[in-house]
């Protein structure tokens, strides 16, 4: 007769009318009983002949691929101009006084962050943008390319210009400025234009047709064409000094950017050298078709314009363009869907490539990528914006994988001890938290993303993919990529991106300048960074609490007025460090804080409402007597495991599921086991914070007997049959709790101390978890344990009762020291930004 749910409850001693604990509990440790119950509940029967179920509610299991959904309306999120202050340590010290060793060490880790992989695999550019959405390939290509461009403009990526140089936007850091090579350097010298151009390889104008043309003018100017020098001098508006524009005249195709030329330029002396203007000209940056502009170290923009297309000779005379897009302009349309129709929509398609404001030298970087990118929804609640997923999983795989640093994540009890209080709470949202932390340029060659350009991408996706040679293709090859699909897609995208279509159709290689999300190093660095900042804030405001986990920062204060003034001063402090907060997402929680999926109040901690709802839905959909694929079980256990500490029996109740996942077998829920779990999760009990106190109750056991010391009373008992020592110690602790009701129990057994009861016989683990819920344990060495003698059957000998103090732990969670009082170098009255004295009047 199968075990009914009522009977099972009684067996687990979850009902009040159970017999004396000393008799009932040891039975649950019996292997025979555990085996019989497992058979009754169908827990052990793992090899089943019925086909497995692969979907339960929203949980999918084996052999199911979740197809990501492409949204053609995705918006690219905007990124603020994030620049974390380089002297962050000094700024913190001005704010709070000398930093602790821990804080300094953590802040030095991220200024700048460094990345040392064991081995880097380079992938061809075709793999830069993953063909994740074959139906929307072109649309996805441009949206991703636009996202990358946005990141580059926000100073989050470097753009590879040549093998050894890169450009970026935003404010440079000192470790980026040291790399002077590759700038346009203005040197003041008395000789006037003698070495007007020094041609050194720098990669600023590499591969552009301007190179040879400028050279030819130099020869002319050396031959004494004076008017030329005059114009140069005027171009500098009278500054004496020779201009060094390091021009790289190579014809070798070092990949990275396609030439920015707009066709062949003859050696007319009018084009380049008279175009060296002051930075005022920057406004007309793209007035000509191709402009390569550079910010030089003295702040002048040096621009080399090619002649505008209007005066360019007809294409038939000159050589073929190397720009795939612009070649369509002069070719005959091959059909109604020829791309030349789109290219002829605009006269001026803008530059072929854009260059950043700053140029730096980088270690040798090949024209390859090290990870692919694709777009997904920003999060389940926000499907209008996209998020870029970067796959750098190569660094976590194989024998050469990087072992990422481990860091402490606060566990539930530590979190409760720390945050369960009667404070008012608010949480701050750090916008684009990962992109705050700068990476050293030496990491760039390992973290490359990019794309091979539209023609290669389209050719790779089309079934008739020929190996087209783009260097010297014929017009026929050019039209190979024309198709109705491409035409329609580009026409729609033209509405969104306009002339940017041209820029985005070129190949590009980008390296990360700030830490990317797809690398195991990033969460570690972010956790170090925010915990150090919170540590500083806690010391600046000793009467308040600041705590963070990754990019989630919470502030707590005694009253709402305190909290508001704390909020103002902390926000200003964070902004002064260059940390960007998202003011729209600041949440005020009142007295119950929502953090890391929990609700934490003065009464303790519970899971958030949306998780409780998910669990209810999960049980509603859970089939009975049908084998469920272990992958689905994994997902179910993930959800239930999060809320397990809030149930009567805790994790031990899920042990049968864990066992089936480990053996990769299907699991069949019997009606009784499902009803048992259902009841467990219907009534959730808060996890309360531990209180400090003196331990007065001690438990000890031998394999044959148990002993307790409760105050000055001593008790002992024997087991019917000898038990494993850990089991005996656990039973003794349960007896101590039920006899004395004490929340603090001294024990000398490390397994009992750890409060992980998953390795005990299943029924005993479940029952013990309920009996010992909310109990704190103190370690007492065996030699000093007052319960040691009674457990050996000696009641007459009294060891003196220990005074064992118990301090609740906050684990290794980034709280270094108890916050000291405000450092002494501040004025004695009160810190200017302190909300401590709301009604403070000057003396």
UniProtKB/Swiss-Prot annotation:
EC identifiers of the protein: 2.7.7.7, 2.7.7.49, 3.1.26.4
UniProt comment concerning the protein's domains: Terminal protein domain (TP) is hepadnavirus-specific. Spacer domain is highly variable and separates the TP and RT domains. Polymerase/reverse-transcriptase domain (RT) and ribonuclease H domain (RH) are similar to retrovirus reverse transcriptase/RNase H.
Regulation of its activity: Activated by host HSP70 and HSP40 in vitro to be able to bind the epsilon loop of the pgRNA. Because deletion of the RNase H region renders the protein partly chaperone-independent, the chaperones may be needed indirectly to relieve occlusion of the RNA-binding site by this domain. Inhibited by several reverse-transcriptase inhibitors: Lamivudine, Adefovir and Entecavir.
One example of a Gene Ontology biological process annotation: DNA replication
Region (Spacer): 178-346
Name listed for the protein in its UniProt record: Protein P
Signal peptide (residue range): none
UniProt source species: Hepatitis B virus genotype C subtype ar (isolate Japan/S-207/1988)
């Amino acid at each position: 007769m199968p075990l009914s749910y009522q009977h099972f409850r009684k067996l687990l001693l979850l009902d009040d009318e159970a017999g004396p604990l000393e008799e009932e509990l040891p039975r649950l440790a019996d292997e025979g009983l555990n085996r019989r119950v497992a058979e009754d509940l169908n827990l052990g029967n793992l090899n089943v002949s019925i086909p497995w179920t692969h979907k339960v509610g929203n949980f999918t299991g084996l052999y199911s691929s979740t197809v990501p959904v492409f949204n053609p309306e995705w918006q690219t999120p905007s990124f603020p101009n994030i620049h974390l202050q380089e002297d962050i340590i000094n700024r913190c010290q001005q704010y709070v006084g000398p930093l602790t060793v821990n804080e300094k060490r953590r802040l030095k880790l991220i200024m700048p962050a460094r990345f040392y992989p064991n081995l880097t695999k380079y992938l061809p550019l075709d793999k830069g943008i993953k063909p994740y959405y074959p139906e929307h390939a072109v649309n996805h290509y441009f949206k991703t390319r636009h996202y990358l461009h946005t990141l580059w403009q926000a100073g989050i990526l470097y753009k590879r210009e040549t093998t050894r140089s890169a450009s970026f936007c935003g404010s440079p850091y000192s470790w980026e400025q040291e790399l002077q090579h590759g700038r346009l350097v203005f040197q003041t010298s008395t000789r006037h234009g003698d070495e007007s151009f020094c041609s050194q390889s720098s990669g600023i104008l590499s591969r552009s047709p301007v190179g040879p043309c400028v050279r030819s003018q130099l020869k002319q100017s050396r031959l004494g064409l004076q008017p030329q020098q005059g114009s140069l001098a005027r171009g500098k508006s009278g500054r004496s000094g020779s201009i060094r524009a390091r021009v790289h005249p190579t014809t070798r195709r070092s990949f990275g950017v396609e030439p920015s030329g707009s066709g062949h330029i003859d050696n007319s002396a009018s084009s380049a050298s008279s175009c060296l203007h002051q930075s005022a000209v920057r406004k007309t940056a793209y007035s000509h078709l191709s402009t390569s502009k550079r910010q030089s170290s003295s702040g002048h923009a040096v621009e080399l314009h090619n002649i505008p297309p209007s005066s360019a000779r007809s294409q038939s005379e000159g050589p073929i363009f190397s720009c795939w897009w612009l070649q369509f302009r002069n070719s005959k349309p091959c059909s109604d869907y020829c791309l030349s129709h789109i290219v002829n929509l605009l006269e001026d398609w803008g530059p072929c490539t854009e260059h950043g404001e700053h140029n730096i030298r980088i270690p040798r970087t090949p024209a390859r990528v090290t990870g692919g990118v694709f777009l997904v929804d920003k999060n389940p609640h926000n499907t209008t914006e996209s998020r870029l997923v970067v796959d750098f999983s190569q660094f976590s795989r194989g024998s050469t994988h990087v072992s990422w640093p481990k860091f402490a994540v606060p566990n539930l009890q530590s979190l409760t001890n720390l945050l369960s209080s009667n404070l008012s709470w608010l949480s701050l949202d750090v916008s684009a938290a990962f992109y705050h932390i700068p990476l050293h340029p030496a990491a760039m060659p390992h973290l490359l993303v990019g794309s091979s350009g539209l023609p290669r991408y389209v050719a790779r996706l089309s079934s008739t993919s020929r190996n087209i040679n783009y260097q010297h293709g014929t017009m026929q090859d050019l039209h190979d990529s024309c198709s109705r699909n491409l035409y329609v897609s580009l026409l729609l995208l033209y509405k969104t991106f306009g002339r940017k279509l041209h820029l985005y159709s070129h190949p590009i290689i980008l390296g990360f300048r700030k830490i990317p999300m797809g690398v195991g190093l990033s969460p570690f660095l972010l956790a170090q960074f925010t915990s150090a900042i919170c540590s500083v804030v806690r010391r600046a405001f000793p009467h308040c609490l600041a705590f963070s986990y990754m990019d989630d920062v919470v502030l707590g204060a005694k009253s709402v007025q305190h909290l508001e003034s704390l909020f103002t001063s902390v926000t200003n402090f964070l902004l002064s460090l260059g940390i960007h907060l998202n003011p729209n997402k600041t949440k005020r929680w009142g007295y119950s804080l929502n953090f890391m999926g929990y609700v934490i109040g003065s009464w303790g901690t519970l899971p958030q409402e949306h998780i409780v709802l998910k669990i209810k839905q999960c049980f509603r959909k859970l089939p009975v007597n049908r084998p469920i694929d272990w992958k689905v079980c994994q997902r179910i256990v993930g959800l239930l495991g999060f809320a397990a500490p809030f149930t009567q029996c805790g994790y031990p109740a899920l042990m049968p599921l864990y066992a089936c996942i480990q053996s990769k077998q299907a699991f069949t829920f019997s009606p009784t086991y499902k009803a048992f779990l259902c009841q467990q999760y219907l009534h959730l009990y808060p996890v309360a914070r531990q209180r400090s106190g003196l331990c007065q109750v001690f438990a000890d056991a031998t394999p044959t007997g148990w002993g307790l010391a409760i105050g000055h009373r001593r008790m002992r008992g024997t087991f019917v049959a000898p038990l494993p020592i850990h089991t005996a110690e656990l039973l003794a602790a349960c007896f101590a709790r039920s006899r004395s009701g004490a929340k603090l129990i001294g024990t000398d057994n490390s397994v009992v101390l750890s409060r992980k009861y998953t390795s005990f016989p299943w029924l005993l683990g479940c029952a013990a978890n309920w009996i010992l819920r909310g109990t704190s344990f103190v370690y007492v060495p065996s030699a000093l344990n007052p319960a040691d003698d009674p457990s050996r059957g000696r009641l007459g000998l009294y060891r003196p009762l220990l005074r064992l103090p118990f301090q609740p732990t906050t684990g290794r969670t980034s709280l270094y020291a108890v916050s000291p009082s405000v450092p002494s170098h501040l004025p004695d009255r009160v810190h200017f930004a302190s909300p401590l004295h709301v009604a403070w009047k000057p003396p």
